[in-house]
UniProtKB/Swiss-Prot annotation:
Protein's name according to its UniProt entry: Large ribosomal subunit protein uL2
Organism taxonomic ancestry: Bacteria, Pseudomonadati, Chlorobiota, Chlorobiia, Chlorobiales
Gene: rplB
SMART domains the UniProt entry points to: Ribosomal_L2 (SM01383), Ribosomal_L2_C (SM01382)
Gene3D superfamilies: 2.30.30.30, Nucleic acid-binding proteins (2.40.50.140), Ribosomal protein L2, domain 3 (4.10.950.10)
The keyword Acyltransferase belongs to this UniProt entry's keyword annotation: no
Xref: HAMAP family: Ribosomal_uL2_B
């Protein structure tokens, strides 16, 4: 994927860049694989904000993605590569030989007409899914299950991949994009290859309005607020103390920099060999 830079004909277009949609082969999605997507505006069922800076944005349909890849032993043909407004990766429309259609995350290099398959012992090639006990060490993988049969939960965004580093007993060791090294059960499935659209991280929105199209609202700095609104509010000029308080804090008074928030008694803690922030 390439990126198109706009000419500076307006202030908004001066820094703006767009992806070149040359890999997209179909503009209209498969109707049978769409669901309504209701916006919450960052509010919960009580109507209170639980996620700030959310709201508005263009209307979308949700594309039903097959994260489980559990249709074993049936070959599918890639019918189209499509845009999905709900994620950074592209999606591929599969036509199975029994007539069923499904969407999957489109890995880098997957083209229309390619054949993909899932199962216990399928060919090691891009787009195929199998348990990690059958994947060779050193392979790049994505859409990885944390619990067998639950469907892929990690390594699903554009350009992401994990490396299958080791296999010992009932567990495989993965090196994740964050730098974390983690153990997962060997029965868990993963898909071969790197997720496509890797240039997504280099896109410059260019103007505030484009953030609003995505449903992202403006953020106000805590230091620019009054003391009643934020622990770091108030003070004369650029008061770094933040209303007499020493350290940067969240709007709810929690230390904002360096405070560890993960529960060390969590059952999965023993599966993390090396944390993502370990030096």
């Amino acid at each position: 994927m390439a990126i198109r830079k706009l000419a500076p004909v307006t202030p908004g277009s001066r820094f703006m860049s767009y992806p070149v949609f040359d890999e997209i082969t179909k503009s209209k999605p498969e109707k049978s694989l769409l669901e309504p997507l209701t916006k919450s505006g960052g509010r919960n069922s009580a109507g209170r904000k639980t996620s700030r800076h959310r709201g508005g944005g263009h209307k979308r349909h949700y594309r039903i993605i097959d994260f489980k890849r559990n249709k074993d032993g049936i070959v599918a043909t890639v019918a189209a590569i499509e845009y999905d407004p709900n994620r950074s990766a592209r999606i591929a429309l599969l036509h199975y030989i029994d007539g069923e259609k499904r969407y999957i995350l489109a890995p880098k290099g997957l083209k229309v007409g390619d054949k993909v398959e899932s199962g216990e012992k399928v060919e090691i090639k891009t787009g195929n899914t199998m348990p990690m006990k059958n994947i060779p060490l050193g392979t790049d993988i994505h859409n990885i299950e944390m619990k067998a049969g639950k469907g892929g939960q990690i390594v699903r965004s554009a350009g992401a991949f994990a490396v299958l580093a080791a296999r010992e007993g009932d567990y495989v060791t993965l090196k994740l994009p964050s730098g974390e090294i983690r153990k997962v059960r060997v029965e868990c499935r993963a898909t071969i290859g790197v997720i496509g659209n890797a240039d997504h991280e280099n896109i410059d929105l260019g103007k505030a309005g484009r953030s609003r199209w995505l449903g992202i609202r403006p953020q106000t700095r805590g230091m620019a607020m009054n003391p009643v609104d934020h622990p770091m509010g108030g003070g004369e000029g650029k008061s770094k103390s933040g209303g007499g308080r020493k350290h940067p804090k969240s709007p709810w008074g929690q230390l904002a920099k360096g405070l560890k928030t993960r529960n060390r008694k969590k059952a999965s803690q023993k599966l993390i060999v090396r944390g993502r922030n370990a030096k």
